[in-house]
Amino acid sequence: MNTKISNTIKFLSADMVQKANSGHPGAPMGLSDIMSVLMKFIKHNPKNPKWLNRDRLVFSGGHASALVYSYLYLSGYDLSLDDLKNFRQLHSRTPGHPEITTNGVEIATGPLGQGIANAVGFALASKYAANLLNDEKTKVIDHKVYCFCGDGDLEEGISYEACALAGFHKLDNLVIIYDSNNITIEGSTNLAWNEDVKARFEAQGFEVARIDGHDFTQIEFALSEAKNKTKPYLIIANTKIAKGALELENTSKSHGAPLGEELIQRAKKEAGFDPDKHFFVSEDVLFQTRAAVEKGDLEEALWKKSLESLTSEKKELLNSLLNPDFSKVEYPDFSGQKLATRDSNGKIINAISKAVPSFLGGSADLAPSNKTTLNDAGTFPDGKNIHFGIREHAMAAINNAIARYGLFVPFSATFFIFSDYLKNSARMAALMKLKHFFIFTHDSI
């Protein structure tokens, strides 16, 4: 059945790109084998995409959106075949790069590398939430964060920043699946990259496995091992871009252009599919994949039942995290005072922190200068002050995910001139309309 589900994902993706006459078929087809297995591991409820204790699935390469939409449709999210047929069309629910307006999309990842830092942010948020809410009897938060990434993501500098922080904090709830197909737009990755990725991630504090990304047994074993890790986990999956696309398989030509109707028909025939049927999903495949709906509904119901055993203090804290109330903040009065704006802002954010449990954040190693230390609030993962190190870009993207997590309102702080290092992340925060505060000081502000 894995093969049949995988081929269904392949040809849904190819059909979407072909009908739109634009898009990226290569990555979805190369990752379909892994996706068909991962679907069995993910804890989620398609009927309630906002269930707090769901696993988070991040697609750092947003161009592989056809894979995202195939997964969401097959799993039973509020997405129809007609939506898939409207791929990349104006005002459709299936835009070229996934947006958070589509149910089941955790975060809009934007430029390459953002999604890796977003995944680290989700994992950090999860760890802090677990420390706040879990007790010996009840695991309010115990989910995983999965992230698909590719060669391009790992070449981007933000991935180094974010993964170094993930390794430092031993984020054992983070699983990164690296689609290692050695292909970029210009050709082979050998044109500009020969890094030992395994050694790099081990040096950053990850556990690393290397698998054949088209061997179902190896995929299943690697994913099952994720539950036993004490560190973040990188799965290097050696894959072929556009697997199953005949002569375009394993070529850069399959990355960002339709495969052509004639080739798709031949590929379908080769795989035992009817070459004349488009957007075809067999009943047995849908029966298998839509089991996620009933399973997820039951898992969430059991989770809700378990919350009844929480203490009244924990229940109150959970409610305040879910519903931050800034009206309770007692803002300081600066009448008659001459203060630098960073000093007055420091007093304001401390007033917010005392009244709003969900408010947290940090600076890129400039908290004493930015005046952004939250007094008497502790240090992450047990407190609100997050030490990001000198990692502006990762900081902002990590906080984007913390803002999307559902429990926290973060801030990112640095000197104004260093905003250049995080503009892509700030742009994504604006596009998603996130509750993410950016604090910039010095440099004539």
Where are these regions (language model features)?
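Conserved acidic/glycine
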Residues: M1-L31, M35, F148-C149, D153-G157, ...
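Glycine-rich beta-alpha junction loops
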Residues: A64, N181-N182, N238-A242, D443-S444
